[in-house]
Design a protein with these regions (language model features):
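Nucleotide/phosphate-binding catalytic cleft detector across ATP-hydrolyzing
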Residues: 1-159, 167-287, 294-340
Length: 340
């Protein structure tokens, strides 16, 4: 863009765990949804990756905040500052003045009017002049490459950090949906609680996240895909002495069982509310998994065996919603399902 560009267009996947921003069809920001603030002035000190490095390590003068919880804004001021800081990271080149922003932002399909207003207000305070919202399952479907305006049913299960979005989409609309606040953060919390109860070792949220990445699983038998045990280091919760505990994927699969079962129940509930003709399409097409939770080892096989419908992991599940918001940004005049 040149010196006299009046409008800048960006698409944003505002996630509980990570925020992704697209500009000119390119991902220009992909950073943790964390902001560090000065406790005395509430001014931003760091955002994204730099702020995450401070998370759980801050001194009394700094507070690090994850502004979104369960997929929605929990701290309005922190969210506004985080959005503003991340938008500044977009490489916009030299300009004589700050352009107005046209934005498309992904939001959970179960959002209330108050929650939608909070996202819109945060975006406007961060510089947005023309703000559109898109439900995340719709964005994920577009990002996967599905024709959301076609007269056939497709089901999307988007397992993010704060919420799991389940939706049946047909003719450019969401026919039935189920949004539950069980997702990646809950799996991480399950691991923290399990390590404390079973192994007497205190682990941070960040360490629990590493355990999930290295040995997280939805099945107790992964066959040849089984990962090696992961060594967890942390203090004994009673004596505070350092410990080293090897953890295998089978025990993590057991500790995640209750949360995964809740996701299964939510999917079955959405299927129960699906009209028969669209249900037949879903059985034929399969169900698409998106979001970071789609990467949990064995989840697609477990769901396929449980529900008896094929589950397909999106080609790039972490970026499905972001890609979809980017495509929606180029079609704001065509996509009637965008919300202003």
């Amino acid at each position: 863009m040149g010196l006299f560009s009046f409008t800048q267009e960006i698409a944003m996947d505002l996630g509980t765990a990570n925020t992704i921003i697209l500009n000119n069809d390119k991902i220009v920001v992909d950073e943790p949804s964390v902001v560090a603030l000065d406790r005395r002035t509430d001014k931003m000190i760091a955002v994204g990756e730099r702020a995450k490095l401070m998370y759980e390590k801050e001194n009394p003068n700094i507070r690090t905040v994850r502004p979104l919880r369960d997929g929605v804004i929990a701290d309005f001021n922190a969210c506004e500052q985080m959005m503003r800081g991340l938008i500044k990271k977009v490489n916009t080149g030299r300009r004589l003045f700050t352009p107005s922003l046209r934005m498309v932002i992904g939001v959970p399909s179960g959002s209330t009017e108050v929650e939608l207003r909070a996202v819109r207000d945060s975006a406007e305070h961060a510089g947005g002049r023309d703000v559109y919202l898109i439900f995340e399952p719709m964005a994920a479907a577009i990002g996967i490459g599905l024709d959301v305006e076609a007269p056939e049913g497709n089901m999307i299960v988007d397992i993010g950090g704060g919420s799991t979005e389940i939706a049946v989409i047909s003719l450019g609309g969401i026919v039935s949906n189920n949004s539950i606040r069980i997702a990646g953060d809950d799996l991480t919390a399950d691991i923290q609680e399990y390590m404390s109860r079973q192994h007497n070792v205190k682990v941070s949220e960040r360490m629990a996240e590493r355990i999930k990445i290295h040995v997280g699983a939805a099945l107790t038998d992964l066959g040849e895909d089984a990962p090696e045990d992961y060594i967890v280091r942390g203090p004994n919760r009673i004596t505070a002495l350092p410990m080293e505990v090897p953890v295998c994927y089978q025990e993590i699969a057991h500790c995640l069982e209750k949360s995964i079962a809740k996701i299964e129940t939510a999917i079955l509930s959405a299927l129960e509310n699906t009209p028969p003709e669209l249900y037949a399409d879903i059985v034929s097409n399969g169900i698409y998994l998106a979001g970071g939770g789609a990467l949990l080892r064995g989840l697609d096989k477990r769901l396929t065996d449980k529900i008896n419908i094929p589950f397909h992991i999106a080609e790039d599940p972490l970026l499905s919603v972001a890609k979809g918001t980017g495509i929606a940004l180029k079609n704001v005049d065509r996509f009637s399902f965008l919300m202003r």
